Amino acid sequence: MGLTIRRIRDWVFTIPFLLGFGLALVVFDVAGRIVRPFGLRPFERVMAALQWTLIAVFRICGTKVSVERSPLVAAGTGYAVVANHQSLFDIVLIGGLLFSNYPKYVAKKELGRFIPSISLNLKHGGNALIDREDRTQAVAAIAEMAATAQARDVSVVILPAGTRSRDGRLGPFRRGGAEAMLAAADCLPVVPAVIDGSWRLLRNGLMPVPFGTVVRVRFGEPLSRHAGDAADVGERAEREIRRTLAAWRAET
């Protein structure tokens, strides 16, 4: 198929995708505001449904999601998830695939404004909004989120690379935030999560979305914990993520 034809095909499917994506954000923003007075758990269920819906919307563009999940990663249980970061779709993937674990996220404070559903969830769903220029505030917010999540037996997620990868290559991990999260949630097993291919979805800034992108996701076996192991278990998770990515790349 020629480049021009592929580009036309991408746009043909991107237009209904963008309409569906925007509609989902607006509808679930309204739903979230309606249920929020009834407590955090109803709100979490609405946001979980949103993330499942957004995964389905990406299928309009022929996106295929291949998932490997350790049988030891159980539903309805709290985990500390350490993942690599390739695109904004990563959060949707983790939230949708671990919906029953009600994952909480670390996000830059700018995302807490003006984005239907997403900003609402980040502000009111027990997540950590951080100022990346203020390390003290960031670490404190992450630790508070993690401690609260552990007390409720829900999951926390951090993407230590911070900046999204533009080409799928894994950059250096920033360990400060991850160690703060793992120290505050020291009873939660650590799950290394690996995502590959999501960077291709947004390489054109959604204008258009490449048709037929394959995204692989792996939730590895939970890593055992012991007292004071935040730095060590974080490094083990990073090694597992890098090892899995290298193995996947070797297959192609």
Question: Model-flagged regions — what are they?
Answer:
Residues 227-252:
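A cross-taxonomic marker for long C-terminal extensions/tails that follow the last structured domain
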Residues 61-68, 139, 200:
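Short gly/ser/thr-rich secondary-structure transition/capping motifs
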